[in-house]
Amino acid sequence: GFEFFAGSGILDFNGKKGDLEDIDKVLEREGYDVCYGLGELETSDDESGVVVIPASQRKSEALNYEIEHEDDAKEDRLGEVLEAAIEYLGDDEPFFIMCEGGEIDWAAHDNNVTEMIDAISRFNEAVSVAYDFYLEHPDETLIIVTADHETGGITIGSNKGYMVDWAGIEKGELPDNENLTGKERNRAISTAHNIGWTTYDHTGAPVPIYAVGKGAEKFAGRIDNTDIYGKVVCE
């Protein structure tokens, strides 16, 4: 199983119907030490496996965007969690870490450029943490940065709004579950800064693959991102 598992919350903490045992109790019974925040992790002496959840998120599925937090309610940042994971796993035995900046995708689904930039910035902090580790262990470390897809079809230096046929927009009704007000706000901010979007969903646009370290040459050129697994395992 996993030795170190951290995230912004647990989906269906008590099952889909809400009638099951708390999942943290189940995890602890299976041998994991559940820590609410990196502060609790620092006092943990469990070497068989830990699960780290933000201190304020015991029964929440996800954090708000970092930029929306109050100054006195900041949660552990992605880079800090990655640094804790590296320290927990140590450098005596080989390890593999998958670290995801998932809020980048969420913000792009909303065409929310402000929060997407903030999420990318925090992901970049995590990449810097990984790169610092690579500098200390250059002959035995491989770092890969990529994405499973692009979202939103973002274009910089586009969309000044002149193509919108405002006179042709007809009055209509909104679905009860669609927050069009928020989406329109996000689009307005993007338009004001000459940023264009093509969709609120995933696109088929190519995504970059960056690699540094041992075996990085295997990731040069164009490859299908589903081939990454095989290249890593072969390494």
Locations of the language-model features?
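A post-motif C-terminal structural segment
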Residues: G1-E235
